[in-house]
């Protein structure tokens, strides 16, 4: 299987459990692309929502996708520090068209001091009923929230000191 090449521009597509498109991020530059991990960088890119709305991101960001974890992270570089937005969802797939995953509603926002907040539990509860998430998905997601919190506490993976900054330096080489 081919994986996105370093320096190439890719699209990121998130879907819902029922197969409908949720959100599309245009033009993320691949900084690392392997069977296990894809790391990308972007800045002020267009994001299209499933309801037709669209908007631009406000700051540079480093995205981290892991083929074994049910979450991905976006490290947003702001004047007052690095914020993370973490999406709970399936491990990524790559099919030459885009990097894809299924979004399962729950999110964790991490602040520069590494405190964090679990978000969208109400949306998850609603979609779990509406889209009939199987019990196994619920178990996987609860374990994944725990794993993600552990990574935050341990400063592991994308939360490691200088992770976002060093990948951002590489991103600047492609701009």
UniProtKB/Swiss-Prot annotation:
It catalyses: a ribonucleoside 5'-triphosphate + H2O = a ribonucleoside 5'-diphosphate + phosphate + H(+); a ribonucleoside 5'-diphosphate + H2O = a ribonucleoside 5'-phosphate + phosphate + H(+). Mg(2+) 1 binds at residues 87, 103, 107. Its cofactor is Mg(2+). The keyword Hydrolase applies. The keyword Magnesium applies. Mg(2+) 2 binds at residues 105, 107, 120, 123. Belongs to the Ntdp family. This is Nucleoside triphosphate/diphosphate phosphatase.
């Amino acid at each position: 299987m081919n994986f996105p090449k370093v320096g190439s521009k890719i699209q990121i597509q998130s879907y819902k459990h029922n197969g409908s498109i949720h959100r599309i991020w245009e033009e993320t530059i691949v900084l690392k692309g392997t069977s296990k991990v894809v790391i990308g960088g972007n800045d002020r890119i267009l994001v299209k929502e499933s309801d037709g709305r669209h908007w631009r991101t406000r700051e540079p960001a480093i995205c981290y996708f892991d083929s074994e974890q049910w979450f991905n992270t976006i490290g947003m570089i702001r004047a007052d520090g690095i914020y993370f937005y973490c999406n709970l969802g399936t491990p990524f797939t790559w099919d030459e068209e885009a990097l894809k995953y299924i979004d399962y509603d729950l999110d964790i926002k991490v602040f520069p001091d590494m405190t964090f907040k679990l978000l969208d539990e109400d949306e998850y509860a609603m979609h779990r009923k509406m889209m009939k998430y199987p019990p196994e998905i619920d178990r996987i997601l609860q374990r994944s929230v725990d794993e993600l919190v552990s990574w935050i506490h341990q400063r592991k993976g994308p939360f490691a000191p200088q992770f976002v900054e060093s990948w951002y330096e590489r991103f600047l080489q492609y701009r």
